[in-house]
């Protein structure tokens, strides 16, 4: 009997691997736990081909997401400046602050593209004027936008 068998994981298992990983485990662990629980299958040539096809599709999907984020970055940079109107007190000071939700709404109004407010990084905005903000569109793609805070 062989000392190790190759298993393709169906689920992520702590300290063993992620879904779709090819791992070598003891035959008893595979036969008595992983396979009956549906956490893995024995690696046959057909299953290995399926795993490769699945990984290829996932890579293509991730590449398409990144390209879409790059296109959104170009769209944001061509617009250049987003205006947010706030009520102003004395000395150009605004009431309240500009929130990431307001910036996300301004971007959506100008581009018809929804941006997650949690991906927007703003400086402290307490007066009217021009400010730079960073919008994270993808883990590898960030865009710099300019925000104009203007009185109502």
UniProtKB/Swiss-Prot annotation:
Swiss-Prot/TrEMBL keywords: Ribonucleoprotein, Ribosomal protein, RNA-binding, rRNA-binding
Entry's Gene Ontology molecular function annotations: rRNA binding; structural constituent of ribosome
Any Pfam family the entry gives: Ribosomal_L9_C
Keyword Transcription found: no
GO-annotated biological processes: translation
A Gene Ontology term for the protein's cellular component: ribonucleoprotein complex
SUPFAM superfamilies membership: L9 N-domain-like (SSF55658), Ribosomal protein L9 C-domain (SSF55653)
Function: Binds to the 23S rRNA.
Family: Belongs to the bacterial ribosomal protein bL9 family.
UniProt name for this protein: Large ribosomal subunit protein bL9
Species classification: Bacteria, Bacillati, Cyanobacteriota, Cyanophyceae, Oscillatoriophycideae
């Amino acid at each position: 009997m062989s000392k190790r068998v190759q298993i393709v994981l169906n689920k992520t298992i702590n300290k063993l691997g992620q879904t779709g990983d090819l791992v070598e485990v003891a035959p008893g662990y595979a036969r008595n736990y992983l396979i009956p629980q549906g956490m893995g299958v024995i690696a046959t040539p057909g299953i290995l081909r399926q795993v490769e096809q699945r990984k290829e599709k996932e890579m293509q999907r991730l590449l398409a997401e990144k390209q879409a984020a790059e296109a959104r970055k170009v769209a944001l940079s061509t617009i250049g400046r987003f205006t947010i109107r706030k009520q102003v007190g004395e000395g150009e000071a605004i009431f309240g602050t500009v929130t990431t939700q307001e910036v996300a709404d301004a971007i959506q109004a100008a581009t018809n593209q929804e941006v997650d407010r949690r991906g927007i990084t703003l400086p402290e905005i307490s007066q009217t004027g021009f400010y730079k903000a960073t919008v994270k569109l993808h883990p590898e793609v960030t865009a710099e936008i300019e925000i104009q805070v203007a009185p109502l």
